Design a protein with these regions (language model features):
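Long, low-complexity intrinsically disordered regions
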Residues: 1-239, 243-312
Length: 312
């Protein structure tokens, strides 16, 4: 569904085309910003890892201790990974686990995941091409040419610029949450851009956006994938909650984070997909019965997803 998030922000991108770009290394997957997967471009991956890696490592310390991942083990694992992937040899996580076992390094489950995240943050590995439905790892230096890296101050400013261009209007706390940076760093990034940004006060909070850009009204319907940027990229998500949003929610299955139906900028329900080789079924669970106009726009959103999933 991550590829569907890309398609929603592209012109007629299909699942096959998105997969092809990923396999070719035009889009990479790694742990950046926060301790979770993100798609990044080859041009951005190194400076993003250098900027956000230290904060991610700090978040990982508890699980490292819990699963016995220490500096000595990481050094041994890095050597095994570098040898195993050398020469364009793309391996799955299970295959790398077998390589570790061959070198008498016993690690699995969350501990293995921790080791591989550290390898990503070290700029040792990144995503390789898919093998069927399985993800592989590649050596970053073989996948992405080395180049100049932004210094820390410039990197914070550039990340702020990217965020508010694509997510504004938003607050400094929104940017801090999304980027994983401290609130102090987030505010410094905003301040460094000076006249590039304008701001407005709404309900007691200061919202920043690109100067000269008028926030557009969101009209229409979209079927968003789980953990879509429209909902999770903000510390305060109250502005997308409509009047029909369920008041009592299970935090483990919060509709904000699942596949949501978005109508005119507000959450209006959830949806599910069932895919076969010839068919893409979409099941809707609206929070309330939509009006006729909303039903028509939701139907168009369903058709767009079907076209994405089925077109070659």
């Amino acid at each position: 569904m991550a590829k569907w998030a890309l398609a929603l922000r592209s012109q007629d991108l299909t699942d096959a085309q998105a997969g092809g770009a990923f396999d070719a290394g035009k889009i990479l997957r790694t742990h950046a910003l926060r301790a979770t997967w993100h798609f990044v471009t080859p041009a951005d991956i190194r400076w993003l890892l250098q900027l956000t890696g230290p904060r991610i490592r700090a978040q990982m310390q508890y699980n490292d201790r819990l699963h016995g991942v220490d500096a000595a083990q990481l050094r041994r694992c890095r050597k095994v990974i570098a040898r195993a992937l050398r020469g364009g040899n793309f391996l799955t996580r299970d295959e790398l686990q077998a390589e570790f076992a061959r070198h008498r390094i016993s690690i699995a489950g969350t501990g293995l995941a921790q080791v591989m995240i550290h390898a990503e943050l070290d700029a040792l590995v990144c995503s390789g091409p898919r093998r069927g439905k399985q993800s592989t790892y590649a050596l970053l230096d073989e996948r992405v040419p080395t180049g100049p890296i932004l210094d820390r101050e410039a990197a914070i400013a550039e990340l702020a610029r990217r965020y508010f261009r694509s997510h504004g209007p938003a607050t400094d706390r929104d940017f801090s949450w999304w980027s994983g940076l401290t609130l102090t760093d987030a505010r410094a990034g905003i301040a460094s851009l000076g006249r590039e940004f304008a701001c407005m006060i709404w309900d007691g909070s200061k919202y920043h956006f690109v100067a000269g850009a008028e926030p557009a009204a969101v009209r229409g319907a979209w079927l968003l994938p789980n953990y879509d940027e429209f909902t999770v990229a903000y510390a305060d998500r109250s502005l997308v909650i409509g009047p029909d949003f369920p008041a009592a929610r299970n935090p483990r299955s919060d509709p904000i984070f699942t596949n949501v139906i978005l109508v005119n900028g507000l959450l209006a329900g959830t949806w599910r997909r069932t895919l076969t080789k010839r068919e893409a079924k979409v099941s809707l669970s609206p929070f309330s019965s939509p009006a006729a106009a909303a039903s028509r726009t939701i139907a168009r959103a369903k058709n767009r997803f079907r076209a994405f999933a089925l077109r070659p």
